[in-house]
């Protein structure tokens, strides 16, 4: 049910030309209950750990993990992506966030995916907690870990503020676009 609502929301957003304004001003969203979101986040992490064992080793060194179990992205020239997530500190749900992006350019389709950001130091956690929305690419450095990068990382070579893993991709999105993702705290 949550996935269907997310897809409908993303499709509706993709059809508006005021996408960046409309999604940036939505401070509170209720796509899933707190219990559902916590369960989905924990299940997503377990699935991530089974497919990327390095992520589990990374979790033991991380100060916190920001998990977005289901991001829905859709577009036809104008596009958008939305999902809600939870910040886990010490393995427990602490705060809730949304992930929003708008895009324009040559693109068509819809897809869903999840991602987890491992915040490796107090600086990264503090930035997330005190910022009025974290725009990826501004603030702490984030390294997106793919299969190739994972092979070259070890717990002794970790130097960046945050590491992100994208998982559970479904659907098809043909896209060459300008995108930015903003993570903002939501009330739960």
Predicted regions and their residues:
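C-terminal segment of classical bacterial N-terminal signal peptides
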Residues: 15-28
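Small-residue-enriched, tightly packed secondary-structure blocks
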Residues: 30-188
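N-terminal secretory signal peptides that target proteins for export/translocation
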Residues: 1-3
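Hydrophobic alpha-helical targeting segments used for export or membrane insertion
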Residues: 5-13, 17
């Amino acid at each position: 049910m949550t996935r269907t609502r997310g897809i409908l929301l993303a499709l509706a957003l993709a059809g508006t030309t005021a996408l960046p304004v409309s999604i940036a001003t939505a401070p509170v969203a209720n796509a899933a209950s707190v219990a559902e979101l916590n369960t989905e986040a924990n299940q997503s992490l377990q699935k991530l750990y089974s497919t990327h064992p390095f992520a589990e080793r990374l979790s033991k060194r991380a100060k916190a993990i920001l998990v977005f179990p289901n991001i829905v992205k859709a577009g036809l020239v104008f596009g958008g992506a939305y999902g809600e997530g939870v910040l886990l500190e010490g393995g427990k749900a602490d705060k809730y966030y949304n992930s929003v992006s708008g895009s324009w350019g040559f693109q068509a389709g819809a897809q869903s995916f999840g991602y987890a950001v491992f915040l490796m130091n107090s600086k990264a956690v503090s930035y997330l907690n005190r910022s009025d929305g974290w725009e990826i690419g501004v603030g702490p450095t984030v390294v997106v870990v793919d299969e190739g990068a994972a092979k070259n990382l070890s717990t002794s070579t970790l130097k960046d503020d945050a590491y992100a893993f994208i998982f559970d991709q479904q659907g098809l999105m043909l896209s060459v676009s300008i995108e930015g993702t903003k993570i903002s705290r939501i009330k739960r």
